[in-house]
């Protein structure tokens, strides 16, 4: 758990934050090992803090959570996906349905057909290799959908690059690039925590989106990781998505839980957040309708 600090409680639609209200919160983000726990967490004393923010709390632990008369709001429910390829790449592929395997093979072939018959992916892990990865990946990231639309591209500042080299020196990082005709078109960045690969950054050249370069690189990365055998569990972290579901071998039902002191201001804040989150959830379910088009328009 972190020390109490100002934390923005966001009213967010898609990638756009419409409003932020700050509270001093003690934060706890559950990693994959913690998410597999069967006992509710022991929360630190609030002292001067306004409350807690618990991310990736297993839903099975919600009922046993010590609420201590606090106001509780679940901001989102989701499955925390992971992939285990410790049995080798062939066993990993065999865990999928025939339809999924056919889909992946079709995407590989489509990319290969448009890249002179090759699927060229490279793994980077030493400090020297990571320096080369950064040189190639940063310009690619800045042209990616993830950077342009979501603001979630690969960090390019000096501190982030120093952290990458430090992780690589400790053998705590795996990074990948996918090339098309000698040009990088997708990147994947996986730091390691407690022996588990963390799905941190995936991006691709938006001009190549029709070739599914992110999917192709993810599959090739898992192939290389399974062959290496050093790290064989990939944590897709909090939040859902078709990409995560596609490559996962399992998942844990989790929730992001906000707990606040029962003040009038906090009651009004949580009431507004519940109403807003409900509208966003219902709008998301209207996929393909006018309501969903409204949500997408906020992301442009």
Q: Where do the language-model regions lie?
A:
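Conserved GNAT acetyl-CoA-binding A-motif
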Residues: 48-57, 225-237
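Conserved acetyl-CoA-binding loop-helix of GNAT-fold acetyltransferases
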Residues: 38-42, 210-223
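A conserved beta-strand-loop-helix scaffold within acyl/acetyltransferase catalytic domains
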Residues: 1-23, 57-210
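Hydrophobic, well-ordered secondary-structure elements that form the walls
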Residues: 182, 214, 218-221, 234, ...
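Structural motif
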Residues: 30-37, 54-60
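Short glycine/serine- and small hydrophobic-enriched flexible loop segments
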Residues: 47, 165-166, 220-227
């Amino acid at each position: 758990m972190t020390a109490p600090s100002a934390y923005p409680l966001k009213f967010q639609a898609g990638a756009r934050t419409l409003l932020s209200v700050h509270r001093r919160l003690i934060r706890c983000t559950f990693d994959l090992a913690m998410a597999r726990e069967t006992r509710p967490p022991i929360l630190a004393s609030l002292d001067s803090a306004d409350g807690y923010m618990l991310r990736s709390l297993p839903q099975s632990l919600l009922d046993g959570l010590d609420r201590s008369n606090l106001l509780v709001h679940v901001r989102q429910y989701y499955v925390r996906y992971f992939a285990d390829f410790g049995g080798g790449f062939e066993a990993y592929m065999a865990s999928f349905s025939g339809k999924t395997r056919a889909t992946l093979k079709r995407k590989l072939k489509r990319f290969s057909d448009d890249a002179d018959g090759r699927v060229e992916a490279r793994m980077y892990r030493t400090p020297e290799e990571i320096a080369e990865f950064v040189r190639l990946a940063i310009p690619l990231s800045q042209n990616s959908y993830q950077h342009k639309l979501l603001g979630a591209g690969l960090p390019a500042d000096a501190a982030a690059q120093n952290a990458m080299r430090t992780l690589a020196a400790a053998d705590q990082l795996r990074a990948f690039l996918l090339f098309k005709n000698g040009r990088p078109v997708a990147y994947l960045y996986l730091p390691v925590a407690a022996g588990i690969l963390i799905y941190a950054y995936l991006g691709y050249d938006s001009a190549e989106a029709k070739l599914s370069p992110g999917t192709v690189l993810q599959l090739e990365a898992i192939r290389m990781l399974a062959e290496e055998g050093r790290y064989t569990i990939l944590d897709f972290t909090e939040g859902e998505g078709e990409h995560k579901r596609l490559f996962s071998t399992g998942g844990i039902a989790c929730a992001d839980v906000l707990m606040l002191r029962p003040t009038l201001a906090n009651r009004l804040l949580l009431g507004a957040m519940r109403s807003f989150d409900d509208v966003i959830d219902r709008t998301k379910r209207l996929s393909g309708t006018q309501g969903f088009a409204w949500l997408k328009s906020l992301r442009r």
